[in-house]
Amino acid sequence: VARTGWDMGIDADEAVVSMKIGEKDTTNHQHNDSGTFQTYYNGYLTGDSSIYALYGTVNDFAWSKETIGHNGLLIYDPNEVSNQTPVVTGGMTRRSPNVMKLESLLTDTYTRAKVIGQEFGPDPIDPEYTYISGDLTPGYTENKVSEVRRSMMFMPTENKEAPAVFFVMDKIVSK
């Protein structure tokens, strides 16, 4: 999470960004939202586009928990088949069984992304930038991509009308 300050409320001139890499897939209630972000400035600007409805409904499995219901990367493969949703949206895949033991989370079976870089500073209390980068390749099917990376950077400004700059940079190598 990166922010321009700590004032709260709808009238506050603070910008806040939440950047998520989401390394492990714990299945069940887990969403396919690795590499997503949410932005807030005088109100909610970006993030999830779905209202979490009833568990187990088509909306729950085909939208709310899927990449398409967030602002993740959709990489469409016309030959892809889904065993989880009624439609193929190009989002991340679910291939992990339910987690039964905590130790199993340490295996590659449950890895959907890896943080490959993060930094903020130089002042840890009032940083000039916040950066995170992740390898999202494990979250997509092997026959679709050989590399998927997303990097995000947040930089506060001194401008009250535009209190921050937020960059999202993607690298996708398809097969």
Where are these regions (language model features)?
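Catalytic and substrate-binding regions of extracellular carbohydrate-active enzymes
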Residues: 1-175
